[in-house]
């Protein structure tokens, strides 16, 4: 979760360590007359994908990873009540006009690249923005990490025994033959040195626990690395693992429909129907 340390300090807010604290902070911000969240789903032909990430994060924080796996594989139907509840949990943030910049009607039409800029306006349009490690590339020119912005782990519930789940995507390197050069390269890629060569170039985050963190190009990536290697559960982006017609189709559009007023149950039913149609 990205935020402005100055905005937090000016308002006496502390970084939440649990989901309970995050929910309480969200309400407190709104009560103080501040808007807690910037959320934007617009992404051209991929509009809706940021909301699928919210859903995946919530599923990992409300149910064991086995339930997440069942959902992603459709062993558990998309319209199971657990999934509907997760969608409505997202709605707690996105559908409350007091909680989101521009009101709930702006969520679907606000560009995902533009939505975090509300952190940096004067006065700020929002206090927090949930997005992956790449998003600083779209922050306004001249803002400085650790000064103008920082981040904290999107927290888990203290009341649920689910550890510290982390959601992510990534690059997989696969050997297509076993000739000596390929074998040696694959062996090299297992060593910290291989990762450290990329770490210093920026834009690269590794789950390798044996690397020297000082090799990262910034404190931001050192902090993100700590979140990644500190995960008790890691799961790959669910929509990326689903069939394309769902994960890059009905799931995207369904989340837009939800933010535009369609019920979570109707959205979940429609997504499940689209999945049934390709089986």
Language-model segments: residues:
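Periplasmic solute-binding protein
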Residues: 1-15, 20-23, 40-71, 167-174, ...
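Conserved C-terminal helix/tail region of periplasmic/extracytoplasmic solute-binding proteins
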Residues: 9, 33, 228-279
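Short helix-initiation/N-cap motifs at beta->coil->alpha
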Residues: 19-23, 104-121
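Glycine-centered hinge/linker elements that transmit conformational signals in sensory
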Residues: 26-28, 72-108, 154
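Alpha-to-beta junction loops
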Residues: 33-36, 122-131
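Short, solvent-exposed loop/beta-turn-alpha elements that line the ligand-binding surface or hinge
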Residues: 41, 45, 60-85, 141-144, ...
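Extracytoplasmic/periplasmic substrate-recognition and gating elements
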Residues: 134, 140-205
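Long, aromatic- and glycine/proline-rich binding clefts that accommodate carbohydrate-like moieties
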Residues: 199-250
């Amino acid at each position: 979760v990205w935020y402005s340390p100055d905005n937090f300090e000016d308002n006496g807010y502390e970084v939440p360590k649990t989901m309970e604290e995050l929910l309480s902070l969200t309400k407190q911000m709104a009560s103080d007359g501040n808007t807690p969240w910037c959320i934007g789903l617009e992404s051209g032909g991929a509009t809706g994908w940021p909301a699928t990430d919210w859903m995946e994060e919530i599923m990992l924080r409300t149910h064991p990873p086995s339930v997440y796996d069942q959902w992603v594989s459709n062993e558990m139907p998309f319209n199971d009540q657990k999934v509907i509840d997760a969608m409505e949990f997202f709605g707690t943030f996105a559908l409350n006009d007091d909680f989101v910049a521009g009101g709930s009607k702006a969520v679907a039409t606000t560009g995902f690249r533009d939505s975090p800029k509300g952190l940096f306006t004067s006065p700020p349009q929002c206090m927090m923005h949930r997005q992956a490690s790449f998003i600083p590339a779209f922050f306004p020119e001249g803002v400085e990490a650790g000064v103008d912005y920082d981040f904290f782990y999107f927290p888990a519930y203290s009341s649920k025994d689910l550890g510290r789940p982390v959601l992510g995507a990534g690059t997989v390197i696969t050997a297509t033959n076993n000739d000596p050069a390929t074998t040696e390269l694959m062996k090299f890629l297992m060593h910290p040195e291989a990762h450290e060569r990329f770490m210093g170039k920026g834009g690269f985050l590794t789950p390798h626990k044996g690397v020297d963190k000082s090799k990262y190009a910034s404190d931001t990536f050192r902090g993100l690395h700590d979140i990644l290697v500190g995960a008790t559960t890691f799961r790959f982006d669910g929509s990326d693992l689903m069939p394309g017609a769902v994960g890059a189709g009905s799931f995207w559009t369904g989340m837009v429909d939800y933010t535009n007023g369609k019920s979570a149950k109707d959205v979940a039913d429609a997504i499940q129907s689209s999945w049934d149609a390709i089986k």
